[in-house]
């Protein structure tokens, strides 16, 4: 069913924008005739969706006005850099490098447990890190990864610097990864997972006939929160970018939340798109 909906979405996205305008005008008139909740109330309900789409902790491509090219999320960049650096470290010292990652993270966290618990947590953290990095990076790491050799201070520091992206990624935990460091007593969902859950829960509580408007409000809120690039030149309308943003928002929320949203989701504000300052020519 999910593949079928995405296929229909892709088919409708390839049609001309004028075709969307027809459904937009009809949808807007129908929307005005209905007893709909207030704009502010809808936007407040969809705040988690705004937060999730802005964080982009999943590989979403949201071409809002300032986004001229596809951008990776910060977590994706951290993951890529982590795997890239880990691949460059010789196999015989990868265990040592991973130990350094564990040490670096534990040193940044408050030491509230006794030494025995810290050692137990460190061993468990090490095992989880091995499994995570092996699955995430698809790079060989010995199964029985033990710190077998002593390295000089300069080599220690160099290894730690190389795997800084790994520490950053694991601390962000934007993927469903749970590394039980000392202060973490139970497996906890990531911040992105929490926001995603809240987003889907709120979207499911909105009546079907109002979901299009709610998603449009999300796209508008994100656009208004983002800085507008101003260069010297002429004003140009940003209707294509706005419609593409809404289309991508629809696709992302359909896939993520598995909630019914009309395939032909009308854009009630399509005929009242403000002229956004986009300059062409001249110096910025």
Swiss-Prot record:
<protein>
    <recommendedName>
        <fullName>Avenin-like b11</fullName>
    </recommendedName>
</protein>
<comment type="function">
    <text>Seed storage protein. Might be integrated via inter-chain disulfide bonds within the glutenin polymer.</text>
</comment>
<keyword id="KW-1015">Disulfide bond</keyword>
<dbReference type="InterPro" id="IPR001954">
    <property type="entry name" value="Glia_glutenin"/>
</dbReference>
<dbReference type="InterPro" id="IPR036312">
    <property type="entry name" value="Bifun_inhib/LTP/seed_sf"/>
</dbReference>
<keyword id="KW-0732">Signal</keyword>
<dbReference type="Pfam" id="PF13016">
    <property type="entry name" value="Gliadin"/>
</dbReference>
<keyword id="KW-0758">Storage protein</keyword>
<dbReference type="InterPro" id="IPR016140">
    <property type="entry name" value="Bifunc_inhib/LTP/seed_store"/>
</dbReference>
<keyword id="KW-0708">Seed storage protein</keyword>
<dbReference type="GO" id="GO:0045735">
    <property type="term" value="F:nutrient reservoir activity"/>
</dbReference>
<feature type="signal peptide">
    <location>
        <begin position="1"/>
        <end position="18"/>
    </location>
</feature>
<comment type="similarity">
    <text>Belongs to the prolamin family.</text>
</comment>
């Amino acid at each position: 069913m999910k593949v079928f909906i995405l296929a229909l979405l892709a088919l409708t996205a390839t049609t001309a924008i004028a075709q969307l305008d027809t459904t937009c005008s009809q949808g807007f008139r129908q929307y005005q005739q209905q007893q709909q909740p207030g704009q502010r109330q809808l936007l407040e309900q969809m705040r988690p969706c705004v937060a999730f789409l802005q964080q982009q902790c999943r590989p979403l491509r949201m071409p809002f006005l300032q986004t001229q090219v596809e951008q990776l999320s910060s977590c994706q960049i951290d993951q890529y850099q982590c795997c890239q650096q880990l691949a460059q470290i010789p196999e015989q010292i990868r265990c040592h490098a991973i130990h350094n990652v564990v040490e670096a993270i534990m040193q940044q966290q408050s030491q509230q447990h006794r030494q025995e618990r810290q050692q137990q947590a460190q061993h468990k953290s090490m095992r989880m890190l091995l499994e995570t990095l092996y699955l995430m990076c698809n790079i060989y790491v010995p199964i029985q990864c033990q710190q077998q050799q002593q390295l000089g201070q300069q080599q220690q520091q160099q290894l730690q610097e190389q795997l800084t992206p790994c520490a950053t990624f694991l601390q962000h935990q934007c993927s469903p990864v749970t590394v039980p460091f000392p202060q973490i007593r139970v497996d906890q969902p990531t911040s992105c997972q929490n926001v995603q859950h809240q987003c889907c829960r709120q979207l499911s509580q909105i009546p079907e006939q109002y979901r299009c408007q709610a998603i449009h409000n999300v796209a508008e809120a994100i656009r208004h929160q983002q800085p507008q690039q101003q260069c010297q030149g002429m004003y140009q309308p940003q209707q294509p970018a706005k419609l593409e943003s809404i289309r991508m928002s629809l696709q992302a929320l359909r896939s993520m939340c598995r909630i019914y949203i009309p395939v032909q989701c009308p854009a009630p504000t399509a005929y009242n798109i403000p002229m956004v300052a986009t300059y062409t020519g001249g110096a910025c």
